[in-house]
Design a protein with these regions (language model features):
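Extended catalytic/binding region for NAD+/ADP-ribose chemistry, centered on the ART fold
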Residues: 47-80
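Active-site and NAD+-binding cores of ADP-ribose-processing enzymes
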Residues: 1-47, 81-204
């Protein structure tokens, strides 16, 4: 893996070339398969770095298996305020039998069985989107949008937030459309997730 600076018309962008070994959690039998378009909602996927216009998909990977698991299992993370409220409810024993529910934070076996984890070697040129050099170039372009979403600034902290996804998706679309001498400038983005460094690789 090597780091360098790439100049585009708007300014300098920090890039990482050939990041090396990455982890992915995906569906059996081939976890590297792109998610089919028929699973896109209204023609668009809703990942943080997916295209808001539905022109491409993003394949997410992480530098560690733990980081991947924390990301894909985030939706099972219990809401502590909701858990406290539920603890205060006295459940009818008959309801528990007729309408059984999983305890908060429990991952059902049905989620686990079709999935597997694997490693691969990632090659290509990836925009280091939270690098200070990149941010200084992108900030004038996206500060207004960040402020409209109620964020105090367009900075690394804003790009690490899970929401509003429209902000990171718009940045992703801009980077996807950036070309140098008629060729795509980036193969994807390298970003800091809430748990570890991660990458998103783009494909139509």
């Amino acid at each position: 893996m090597s780091s360098s600076i790439l100049s585009i018309s708007q300014g300098d962008i920090a890039v990482v070339t050939d990041p090396g070994t990455v982890w992915r959690v995906g569906y059996r039998p081939d976890p590297w398969t792109w998610t089919p378009w028929q699973y896109a909602e209204n023609g668009r996927f809703n990942g943080r770095w997916d295209d808001p216009d539905g022109n491409y998909r993003t394949l997410y990977t992480g530098t560690t298996l733990l980081g991947c698991l924390l990301e894909v299992l985030a939706r099972f993370r219990p809401d502590l305020a909701l858990v406290n409220e539920l603890d205060g409810i006295i459940e009818d024993p008959d309801d528990h039998v007729v309408y059984p529910t999983s305890a908060p934070g429990i991952v059902p076996r049905s989620w686990l069985l079709p999935r597997t984890a694997t490693t691969g070697t990632l090659i290509g040129t990836f925009c280091a989107v939270t690098n200070s050099t990149t941010l200084s170039t992108l900030r004038p372009l996206f500060l207004g949008q960040a402020l409209r979403y109620g964020l105090p600034d367009f900075d690394a902290a804003a790009l690490r937030l899970a929401k509003p996804r429209a902000l990171t998706q718009t940045v992703s679309s801009f980077l996807y459309g950036t070309t140098i001498r008629g060729e795509a400038a980036f193969d994807g983005v390298q970003f800091q997730s809430s748990s570890s460094p991660a990458t998103g690789t783009n494909s139509p």
